[in-house]
Amino acid sequence: MNRRNRGSSSSSSRVSNTYGNRQFSDNPRTGSGGGVNESFQRRSDAPHKRNNEKDESKHKDEDPADVSLIVGTCSSMCPERERVTRERLRDLAVFERLYGNPSKSSTEIAVKKFCRTLSAADVQASDVRPLPVLEETLRYLLSLLDSKEHPFEVVHDFIFDRTRSIRQDLSIQNLANERVIYLYEEMVKFHVISHERLQSCSGTSISSMHHLNMEQLAKTLTSLYNIYDANRKPDYIYENEAEFRSLYVLLHLNPSSGVMGEPLSLWFRKLTFALVKSKEICFVRNLLRLYRMGNYKNFLSRTASEATYLQYCISEHHIREMRLVAVQYINNVCYKLQPYPLLRLSQNLKMKELDVESLCHECGLETCTDPDGFTVLPVKQSTFRSPEDKFKVYDLIGIERIKMSI
């Protein structure tokens, strides 16, 4: 792997102190790394309390944020000290094993793990990667996303942990410039794509992985929004900002999910006028209205014709919900003596006709052929049921256009 742009990041990579000190976790409540770590504050403040008056006078004008600032000097994706330790403990992921050896790795494939118990006393500049190395690390991780050698859940689990470590290193160094915005956007993409792909995986741990992925998606989005705001310029929207802001709205399609904490009514008040009027925000607001009205036809039609790939990935579960609602509506309210044509239903649900027939069967409904040879759905059937297990994912007509937007 080529090593480019190595070395410490410049001072321009850091926002002003108004952005706030952040703890060394990936909690994003007040920034890309979260609020102030109280234990870290105590460690930083204690020496000052013990200093004599002369020392206090000497340091009285220093900003605590500057005292704790760390500039990473690690030039590889994983600090040598960590790599050697994990080799000894045989703690290497499958992607980090040199020729499959569980106790041997290299600087080209070992990636720093996320540490849940990191404190200020543990941090050394040689263990922290500067921005150019973090950029290279993320490129390497995302290159594994389409790996066919291992199941997706294995790939996801590795990238999931290592991107948290990237966010942790960004937080330690208080990095939040435009290059960092790009890193966060790419990490959000990873979580969104994982959200969609994990739906098709099976296994006892998938439910937990899906929950944790959504949790980190929410945190990463919150961090990204904070960095957008910290770098805000008058009357300026970042190139992808409106699309990434729109994902917050889509995560509120189901208000009981509790994925994102702040109510939409409060969240919208914080957006700039330009963002509120952007086509991406207008689109998802309309989609939200259609979803809550149960207007499945327009919801699916607008999604197929206007959604980006990231918006589609977030909406996919709700697309399945709306299709179930539609089949139930048709079965309950249509005239019994006039079976409903599956061709018309497929057009409304943006599905292939054969897929609609399969969906009806999953819902416990029978289909038949009318005298003209068309497949129809007899209505008023008492056997309708919502599939108990995860039912099959059916393509949305228009998915080709959507996938081209990624």
From Swiss-Prot:
Possible component of the TREX-2 complex (transcription and export complex 2), a muliprotein complex that functions in docking export-competent ribonucleoprotein particles (mRNPs) to the nuclear entrance of the nuclear pore complex (nuclear basket). TREX-2 participates in mRNA export and accurate chromatin positioning in the nucleus by tethering genes to the nuclear periphery. It comes from Arabidopsis thaliana (Mouse-ear cress). Disulfide bonds: none annotated. Residues 40-62 have a biased composition (Basic and acidic residues). This is SAC3 family protein C. It comes from the Eukaryota. Disruption phenotype: No visible phenotype. Sac3a, sac3b and sac3c triple mutants show no visible phenotype. Residues 213-389 form the PCI domain. Residues 7-17 have a biased composition (Low complexity). Pfam families: SAC3_GANP. The lineage of its organism: Eukaryota, Viridiplantae, Streptophyta, Embryophyta, Tracheophyta. Residues 18-30 have a biased composition (Polar residues). Gene3D superfamilies: 1.25.40.990. Residues 1-66 are annotated as: Disordered. InterPro entries: PCI_dom (IPR000717), SAC3/GANP/THP3 (IPR045107), SAC3/GANP/THP3_conserved (IPR005062). Belongs to the SAC3 family.
